[in-house]
Structures are given as C-alpha cells and as structure tokens.
Amino acid sequence: MQNTIRIIGIDPGLRRTGWGVIDTLGNSLRFVASGTVTSDGDMDLASRLCQLHDGLADIVHGYKPDEAAVEQTFVNKDAVATLKLGQARGIAMLVPARAGLPVAEYAPNAVKKAVIGVGHGEKQQIHMMLKILMPKAEFKGNDAADALAIAICHAHNRGANRLRQAALAG
C-alpha cells in the first residue's frame, strides 16, 4: 500500500524565494499551498539570508514535508548576482536538510521538461500546465509557480532517483 508523500519545492532567490507544497500518491498530485518568502532589500546580506532562513523554516515546520527539491542555480554574466543567488540557494537547501529531509536538485530545463514536456518554455506555459495538473492550485507570481513546478518535477523523478542511489550503493 502506498503512502502519501508531501514534497516542498523551493525556487531560491535573494529577494523572493518561492515555495510550493504538494502531496503525491502514486501518480496523483494534490496542491497543498504555495507562496514566497521575501527579504528586505534595504538590509545587509547576512540579515536578508536570516530572513530567508527563518521564513523557510516556518514553512517547513508548518507543512511538515517528507522530501524537498530545490532548483539549481544557473550562472549568468553578473558574477556578484550569481554568488548572491548561490547563497540564497544554500539557505534553501540547508533549511530542509536541517529538518531531516532528503533534498533533491533539478536544473531549470529538467523542471520545465517535467511540467510542460520540453526543456525550454515560457512562464505562461508553466502556469497553464500547473492548472491542468492541479486544478485547485493557487499561486501568486512566478516564484511560487516555479516552486510548484520543482515539486512536480521531483514527484515525477523521485522513484528513478531512489533506484539510481540503490544501484550506486549496492
């Protein structure tokens, strides 16, 4: 008998970190909640990272997910922005890991492929597919929608990930 698995998807960002929580049972997906954790751009970097940490910790504590998935960082031409995003991503991975959750990572194109069928697509396509896959899904903005897409990507890939880990271990 299968158990429901609760997954939190996290789309890291220094200004806004999106989060989305879904329940999975077999191939079925159920929307639970989504939103964003924001940091105050007028504060110093360390304080902003603390805001992200505390906000995500509250979400993880409140929704009690079983597993987490975080989007990988892409490198752009602005090295400083990339480093700051990497620090926010570290928080996004640390919070669920400290709560004892396994944390998976997915490239942005893998997330898009899992949700819309191709690795390159527009935000509107993701929004549309989220509503098709989970008609009761509510999300305000791209960050929360992306986080739900990351959770769905993990739901589709978690079985393959477990098999891969078992093969490497044994």
Curated annotation (Swiss-Prot):
Gene3D superfamilies: Ribonuclease H-like superfamily/Ribonuclease H (3.30.420.10). Binds 2 Mg(2+) ion per subunit. InterPro entries: RNaseH-like_sf, RNaseH_sf, X-over_junc_endoDNase_Mg_BS, X-over_junc_endoDNase_RuvC. PROSITE patterns: RUVC. GO terms for biological process: DNA recombination; DNA repair. The keyword DNA damage applies. Keywords: Cytoplasm, DNA damage, DNA recombination, DNA repair, DNA-binding, Endonuclease, Hydrolase, Magnesium, Metal-binding, Nuclease. It catalyses: Endonucleolytic cleavage at a junction such as a reciprocal single-stranded crossover between two homologous DNA duplexes (Holliday junction). Its EC number is 3.1.21.10. Mg(2+) 2 binds at E71. Belongs to the RuvC family. Homodimer which binds Holliday junction (HJ) DNA. The HJ becomes 2-fold symmetrical on binding to RuvC with unstacked arms; it has a different conformation from HJ DNA in complex with RuvA. In the full resolvosome a probable DNA-RuvA(4)-RuvB(12)-RuvC(2) complex forms which resolves the HJ. The RuvA-RuvB-RuvC complex processes Holliday junction (HJ) DNA during genetic recombination and DNA repair. Endonuclease that resolves HJ intermediates. Cleaves cruciform DNA by making single-stranded nicks across the HJ at symmetrical positions within the homologous arms, yielding a 5'-phosphate and a 3'-hydroxyl group; requires a central core of homology in the junction. The consensus cleavage sequence is 5'-(A/T)TT(C/G)-3'. Cleavage occurs on the 3'-side of the TT dinucleotide at the point of strand exchange. PANTHER family: CROSSOVER JUNCTION ENDODEOXYRIBONUCLEASE RUVC (PTHR30194:SF3). This is Crossover junction endodeoxyribonuclease RuvC. It comes from Rhizobium rhizogenes (strain K84 / ATCC BAA-868) (Agrobacterium radiobacter). The lineage of its organism: Bacteria, Pseudomonadati, Pseudomonadota, Alphaproteobacteria, Hyphomicrobiales.
